[in-house]
Amino acid sequence: MLDPTLLRQQLAKLAECLSTVRGFTLDVAALEALESERKRIQVHTQELQSLRNSKSKAIGQARSKGEDVSSLMAEVAAFSDDLKASEIALEEIRTELEKVALGIPNLPQQDVPLGADERDNVEQARWGVPRTFDFSIKDHVELGACHGWLDAESAAKLSGARFTVLRGPIARLHRALAQCMLDLHVRQHGYEEVNVPIIVNADSLYGTGQLPKFEEDMFSTQLGEHRRYLISTSEISLTNLVRNEIIEADRLPLRMAAHSLCFRSEAGSGGRDTRGMIRQHQFEKVELVSVCKPQESEGEHQRMTRCAETVLEMLGLPYRKILLCTGDMGFAATKTYDLEVWLPSQGMYREISSCSNCGDFQARRMQARWRNSVTGKPELVHTLNGSGVAVGRAMIAVMENYQNADGSITVPEVLRPYMDGLSRIG
């Protein structure tokens, strides 16, 4: 959520900025009307509250003197219903204004390139050289079919489209990847390993920005009278650990890592990536989350992105680093780097990690604060999140980049300790 003072004091300027850099239309006239009505109701409510307080004081004084207070009580009763109705109306219009504010995306940092979509993203760097094959290569679907490793047919019987059953050595490789990533981030990068719930309440989703805007992307379940949601990323659970908290300065930065199942409806994906495991309803990720002081978030963003890059480098997977433009960034982000891994079968780089600095956008929604040791006052923290990395896509990249002419897969050296020393599968 943006700073409310921007909506109250710089509405026209904010609307112009959102339109230019985010392609987001803010209804200025409607917001001005709401704000004007809020002020009117608030003034009326305060006047009635002041009148009630003065009458209550007069009643107390009269009673202490033994005087009859029936007329004063009648006066209070006469406007009490009006006061109650005014308080309800004020709360309703505040809720309406908050609903509008919750639907406004974050503003980008000044160094984020202006653009409409992914075509305007800016490549920052490349690592590794794509392998040249001396045989006809297969994609991960064909490689999986050769050995019965990837079973979409059984998954469809169990759950429907966009699910896959992993069998045998490839399931083991998938597990090895997740364990290796988590060990790297915990042992070498200083993240605390956290095991989090994958079913969360609506408050958690409002906190990180998935609700109210992206409800159609979420899987949900009804538990009695309460609706719960399956997480689309463990960023949700990890970040909300600091919701409504005041963190002492010496505890920052907080760095947390989690390996979890994730669930997405892919409502807006249309017919993209229907073949194979690129875009699934259920997948796994190792997620990184940092909570820090505002002045440290840019450095923390660079550090987090570098931690994700290290995963791809230790696996020997060629990748490129992309700075997303204003029109391609996520709703809550103020700056985002994507890492894209090379897939030989497609002859292109595909996203495998997204690392975002959200500034104080999520913190304001969650009321996540730190105590400034100089002023002694609580201030909003900055939150960051990044994939470190998507496990299924890493498995696909390993399968394709490490394939052999006979359809076997060479196991990257860093994974062999997790696979009892196996150097090849298939």
Curated annotation (Swiss-Prot):
One of its GO terms (cellular component) is cytoplasm. Its EC number is 6.1.1.11. Keywords: Aminoacyl-tRNA synthetase, ATP-binding, Cytoplasm, Ligase, Nucleotide-binding, Protein biosynthesis. L-serine binds at T233, S234, E235, E287, S387. The keyword Secreted does not apply. InterPro entries: aa-tRNA-synt_IIb, aa-tRNA-synth_II, aa-tRNA-synth_II/BPL/LPL, Ser-tRNA-ligase_type_1, Ser-tRNA-synth_1_N, SerRS_1_N_sf, SerRS_core, tRNA-bd_arm. ATP binds at R264, S265, E266, E351, I352, S353, S354. One of its GO terms (biological process) is selenocysteine biosynthetic process. One of its GO terms (molecular function) is ATP binding. Its main location: cytoplasm. It comes from the Bacteria. It is found in: Cytoplasm. Pathway: Aminoacyl-tRNA biosynthesis; selenocysteinyl-tRNA(Sec) biosynthesis; L-seryl-tRNA(Sec) from L-serine and tRNA(Sec): step 1/1. CDD domains: SerRS_core. Pfam families: Seryl_tRNA_N (PF02403), tRNA-synt_2b (PF00587). It catalyses: tRNA(Ser) + L-serine + ATP = L-seryl-tRNA(Ser) + AMP + diphosphate + H(+); tRNA(Sec) + L-serine + ATP = L-seryl-tRNA(Sec) + AMP + diphosphate + H(+). Consists of two distinct domains, a catalytic core and a N-terminal extension that is involved in tRNA binding. PANTHER family: SERINE--TRNA LIGASE (PTHR43697:SF1), SERYL-TRNA SYNTHETASE (PTHR43697). Catalyzes the attachment of serine to tRNA(Ser). Is also able to aminoacylate tRNA(Sec) with serine, to form the misacylated tRNA L-seryl-tRNA(Sec), which will be further converted into selenocysteinyl-tRNA(Sec). Homodimer. The tRNA molecule binds across the dimer. Belongs to the class-II aminoacyl-tRNA synthetase family. Type-1 seryl-tRNA synthetase subfamily. This is Serine--tRNA ligase. It comes from Xylella fastidiosa (strain 9a5c). The lineage of its organism: Bacteria, Pseudomonadati, Pseudomonadota, Gammaproteobacteria, Lysobacterales. The gene is serS.
